Amino acid sequence: MRHKLGQRKLGRTSSHRIALLRNMAAALIKHEQITTTLPKARELRPYLEKLITLGKKGGLSNRRLAHARLLDEAQEQKLFTTLAERYADRNGGYTRIIKAGYRASDAAPLAVIELVDRDTSAKGQDSGPVLTADEDEFEAA
């Protein structure tokens, strides 16, 4: 029986679920706000809170643990520098989940998960290729 087991399966195998959490954690650290389904946001919250706590503690062993859970060098660096400094005086509660209605296609409940005291300029940062002025002129021709 599955009584009192802690995590949601999210309809995925264990390896798929771990990869999902890693990718979502990296995206949330990078953009500091993401929109996803409510169950995914609720699963991501404790995963990310533990990562931020590792970043606050610092040290080589904690950096290795974070690298094993995150697998993204740039976000790992941000975790141990920017976020560790930002949340130095906060004991937990680094994230906020805001319900955002329902998805039109399948009526899945949506939520916005964001870092508390987030940097609003980080939203959409490095989201993909950006056209330069030269490329715009080339496409117009």
From Swiss-Prot:
InterPro entries xref list: Ribosomal_bL17 (IPR000456), Ribosomal_bL17_CS (IPR047859), Ribosomal_bL17_sf (IPR036373)
This protein's UniProt keywords: Ribonucleoprotein, Ribosomal protein
Any one GO molecular-function label of the UniProt entry: structural constituent of ribosome
Xref: Gene3D superfamilies: Ribosomal protein L17 (3.90.1030.10)
Sequence intervals crossing the membrane: none
GO biological process terms on file: translation
Residue span of region Disordered: 120-141
Alphabetical list of SUPFAM superfamilies matching this protein: Prokaryotic ribosomal protein L17
Record Pfam families: Ribosomal_L17
UniProt KW Secreted keyword: no
A single GO cellular-component term on record: cytosolic large ribosomal subunit
Family affiliation: Belongs to the bacterial ribosomal protein bL17 family.
NCBIfam families: L17
Binding partners and assembly: Part of the 50S ribosomal subunit. Contacts protein L32.
The name this protein goes by in its record: Large ribosomal subunit protein bL17
Species: Novosphingobium aromaticivorans (strain ATCC 700278 / DSM 12444 / CCUG 56034 / CIP 105152 / NBRC 16084 / F199)
